[in-house]
Swiss-Prot record:
Annotated S-S bridges: none
Native organism: Shewanella oneidensis (strain ATCC 700550 / JCM 31522 / CIP 106686 / LMG 19005 / NCIMB 14063 / MR-1)
PROSITE patterns attached to this UniProt entry: AA_TRNA_LIGASE_II
Keyword Repeat: no
Keyword presence, Aminoacyl-tRNA synthetase: yes
One GO location term (cellular component): cytoplasm
Catalytic reaction equation(s): tRNA(His) + L-histidine + ATP = L-histidyl-tRNA(His) + AMP + diphosphate + H(+)
Protein name stated in the entry: Histidine--tRNA ligase
SUPFAM superfamilies assigned: Class II aaRS ABD-related, Class II aaRS and biotin synthetases
Amino acid sequence: MAKQIQAIRGMNDILPTQSPLWQKVEAVLRSSVAAYGYSEIRTPIVENTDLFKRSIGEVTDIVEKEMYTFEDRNGDSLTLRPEGTASTVRAGNEHGLLYNQEQRLWYMGPMFRHERPQKGRYRQFHQFGVEIYGIGSADIDAEVLMLSARLWEKLGITEHVTLELNTLGDPAERAAYREALIAFLEQHKDKLDEDSQRRMYSNPLRVLDSKDPQVQSILADAPALMDYLGEESSQHFAQLRELLDAVGIQYRVNSRLVRGLDYYNRTVFEWVTNSLGSQGTVLAGGRYDGLVAQLGGKETPAVGFAMGLERIVLLLETLALTQDIPAEVDVYVAAMGDNCLVEAIKVAQELRSALPTLRVMSHCGGGNLKKQMKRADKSGAQVALLIGEEELAEGVVTVKYLRNDNEQQRVARNALSAFLAELTK
C-alpha cells in the first residue's frame, strides 16, 4: 500500500462535520457587515514580499520569523499573505479606491504564518477583517467597535469577551515616548529577558507587551504614553470613550496594550477572553493613518480590525454554544423499489424548484428500505419521503418523521411543497 500523504503541520482540514459551525460564523459576519453598509474586497493570497516589509515592519516577529517567503521562476520575492490590511491598502492604492474617497471594506480568507502550531494558533488560519478609509474622527473608531460588539451579540458570546482599549498617539508623540521608554529600559537592561533586550532599541513599545513576569514588574514604574499625548490625540481618545459609554459598550483602558504591527497610531484595541488559555485575543485592531501614504498613496486616515475564525470556532466549542447548528439536510427522498426510482428523483427535483431554500437529498446507490432509512437518519434530515408502487398509484408520498415520534402520514403529491414549507419554516 502506498504511503499516505498528510496535511502540512499547522494547516488543518475543515471536515464536513465541522463546516456547519464555520458556515454559521461566516453567515453572522457577512450579515453584520452588510447591516453596516460595508463592501467586500478580495485580494490575492500571494503578494510581493516588499509589501509586508514596508507595512508590517522589518523588525517585527512576523517579518523576521513567520512569513512564508519564496522566489518564483523570475527571481521575484513573493510571500503568502500573513495578514489582510496591507493587501487591502495595496489594492486600494492600485485601483484608485482611496484617493479623496471614503471606503468601508471587509474581507475574509486564509492567511499564513510559520508559527509553532498550538491550540487556537495555526500556520494557515482564516481571517475576517474590516477596513475603513477616509474618515479620521473618533466616531468611526466607535463604529468599528460597535460592529465588533454586534458580532459577539449575534454569536452569543458577549458575556465571555472583554474590550481593552489604548491610544498610541500620533507619530511625533510616540517618538518622544519611545525615547523616554528606551532611557527607562536602559536602566534595567540587565534584568530584561532576551526578547526584550533585542526589542529595546528596534521596537521598544513591544517590550510593553512582554509576557515575562519580571519584565512586567519592571514596567510598573515605566513612563506612561498617556503623559506624552498632545491635545488632539487626548481629545480623540476622550471622544471615543464618550461614544462607547453612550452606547453601553464596556471597556478597560490598558496602557500596556500595543499592537504587534508597526503601522498603528492613536486608537488600538483588543477583545479578549479568559476561556481559551494563553490564546486570549479573539479580535484586534486600531487606527493606521500613515499606512496608505507609506505604501505609495495619498495621506489617508484609516482604521480597522481583524479576527481569526479558528479562534472564534474554538471559543464557541469551548463554551458549548454549538447545539443550535442545523443539519445539512431537511428532507431525504427514498425509492421503495427500482420501478419507483425515476419518480423519486422527479419528486426531489420538483421540491428543489418549488422550495429553493429546502435542502433535499436523494438516496442513490440502491439498497433495501432498512439501508435507506439508516442513511436518511445519518443525514440529519427531519423527514424521509418514501415513494413506492402504492404511493405512485395513489398520487401520494409517505412522510416518515425522523426526529420525533409523530406517526408517518401520506400527503398528496400536488400538496407536498406547501406541506414541507410549513413543516420546515
